């Protein structure tokens, strides 16, 4: 398992493979062409040959949650376009991110001057609309990676995915707003039925909704709520998703990948 940052993965990748070991990367350091992302709950298509050392990427936590939900939805609709807004916990940045949020919160509550360190501005009691640097078109690397991982996990490389990743002032647990444009009118009852039956998904009853801190943190399930059609377009479906980014999105999936490789 490599979860110590992209630089560590790149530095030791060849040494690991030369030793006859397979590598499970949680740092998103390797291109998906070299280390395809795998979500065992969706099957093992795309997994490299297990008879030799290989590199496998554990998908980003948001991709795990999104792909699980979309795989269930594909039983009753055909996605034509995805709009995804991911509000990510500060633990996305690792231990330093958790420490930064705790420190900023303490400084503000004690009326002390705020000095951002790990991030470039105030994140406590705030929402940051960008994570990392952006390219010439305004897209962050994490957003592009998220879109490509969802496409690969669904086996739909041409599926348009518009992703926005924001940094939220919570320690653990990601929240996602997912919009799905289908090729025809959507049967909401059928959607609810497949979500209720899907492995790894907990559908919250109508009139209620899940939260990351109140429902998802510490759980192995992906929570889904606020399932509804578009206001004026019966081909559009909107959902709210909450998931534990560390437990479900990273650790559990990495262990499940390892079980396939052993």
What does each model-identified segment do?
Residues 65, 138, 187, 249-250:
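Secondary-structure boundary/capping motif
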Residues 1-121, 158-160, 222-223, 227-232, ...:
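N-terminal Rossmann-like NAD(P) cofactor-binding subdomain of oxidoreductases
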Residues 81, 86-238:
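C-terminal substrate-binding/catalytic lobe of Rossmann-fold NAD(P)-dependent oxidoreductases
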Residues 167-169, 244-248:
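Glycine-rich phosphate/pyrophosphate-binding beta-alpha loops
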Residues 216-223, 248-251, 260-262:
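Extended alpha-helical regions
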Residues 8, 176, 252:
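Short, flexible micro-motifs
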């Amino acid at each position: 398992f490599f979860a110590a940052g992209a630089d560590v993965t790149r530095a030791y990748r060849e040494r690991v493979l030369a030793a006859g070991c397979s590598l499970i990367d949680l740092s998103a350091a390797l291109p998906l062409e070299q280390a395809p992302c795998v979500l065992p709950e969706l099957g093992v298509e795309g997994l490299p040959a297990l008879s030799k050392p290989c590199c496998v990427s554990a998908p980003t936590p948001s991709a795990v949650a999104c792909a699980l939900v979309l795989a269930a939805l594909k039983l009753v609709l055909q996605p034509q376009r995805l709009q995804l807004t991911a509000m990510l916990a500060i633990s996305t940045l690792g231990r330093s991110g958790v420490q930064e949020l705790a420190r900023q919160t303490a400084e503000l509550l004690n009326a002390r001057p705020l000095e951002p360190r790990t991030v470039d501005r105030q994140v406590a009691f705030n929402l940051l609309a960008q994570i990392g640097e952006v390219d010439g078109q305004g897209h962050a690397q994490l957003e592009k990676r998220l879109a490509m991982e969802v496409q690969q996990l669904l086996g739909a490389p041409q599926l348009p995915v518009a992703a926005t990743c924001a940094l939220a002032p919570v320690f653990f647990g990601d929240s996602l707003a997912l919009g799905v444009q289908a090729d025809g009118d959507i049967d909401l009852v059928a959607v609810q039925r497949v979500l209720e039956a899907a492995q790894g998904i907990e559908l919250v009853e109508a009139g209620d909704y899940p939260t990351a801190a109140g429902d998802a943190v510490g759980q192995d399930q992906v929570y889904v709520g606020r399932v509804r059609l578009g206001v004026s377009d019966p081909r559009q479906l909107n959902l709210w998703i909450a998931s534990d980014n560390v437990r479900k999105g990273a650790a559990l999936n990495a262990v499940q990948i390892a079980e396939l490789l052993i």
